[in-house]
Amino acid sequence: MARRSSRHAAAHADDSVFEPFFIPGRGPAATKHGGLAAEPERERSYLAKIRPQSDGQRALMAALERHSLTVALGPAGSGKTYLAIAAAVEALTSGRVGRIVLTRPAVEAGENLGFLPGEMEDKLAPYLRPLYDALNERIGGKRVKQLMTEGAIEIAPIAFMRGRTLNNAFIVIDEAQNCTYGQIKMLLTRLGWHSTMVVTGDPDQTDLLEGMSGLRDIARRLEPLTEIAVIRLSDRDIVRHPLVAGMLTVL
């Protein structure tokens, strides 16, 4: 599956100018969806400034560039979801893919989902909010709504992925530690032609009953395959408030 030549080589020599996720106005998607060329200068310059803050993040960014399937394991705040979504946005706006598909399990909803007010979209919104937040921070809420209306961005719970084949897409599976082995296997087989998939999660923070999460086992089985990247981030890669890393070591 390794297919793209790395554009990082020269940039790695100087992290202060490391800008791998911005190619303004290139490719058909940039025209079809308005591209970044139509965005205000403030937003375009902000998009250009995504940079790795650690060796682990640097390895993840390189893997996202080179592999069709990447599994990113790491604690909260290590940047795995944000970097995956940043790569997805770049792939869409540069024309490498035609759409972004973001999915995560709605574990907390469970059987109580039916008691929540509103239509299904309203019921699921709180559980998909972290994905909206990452997109909004990346390209702005107005742009996110526009791309979702056009069908260029889809955010859905994992249950909605069954039976689909996702071609020409960048797929991010977030919070995969809350998926069973069977669910992750099902999701991996959704990968279609000309697509990239990223699976992110922290095996140490699952909300499932002990032994039910399949993320750790899936990562172990996939790691020997050279066509697939398995990146393991650690507390050293956390870029949230310094207290987060400290708390994770004792809680």
At which residue positions do the language-model features occur?
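Conserved coupling/interface region of RecA-like P-loop/ASCE motor cores
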Residues: 218-251
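Conserved P-loop
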Residues: 71-78, 82-152, 209-224
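Loop/turn-to-beta-strand initiation segments
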Residues: 96-98, 150-153, 167-170, 184, ...
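Conserved helicase/translocase P-loop NTPase motor core
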Residues: 147-164
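Catalytic acidic motif of RecA-like/P-loop NTPases
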Residues: 77, 159, 177-178, 204
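Interdomain "pre-motor" coupling segment immediately N-terminal to P-loop NTPase/helicase cores
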Residues: 1-39
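Pre-Walker A adenine-sensing motif
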Residues: 50-67
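Conserved P-loop NTPase nucleotide-binding/switch module
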Residues: 106, 110-117, 170, 179, ...
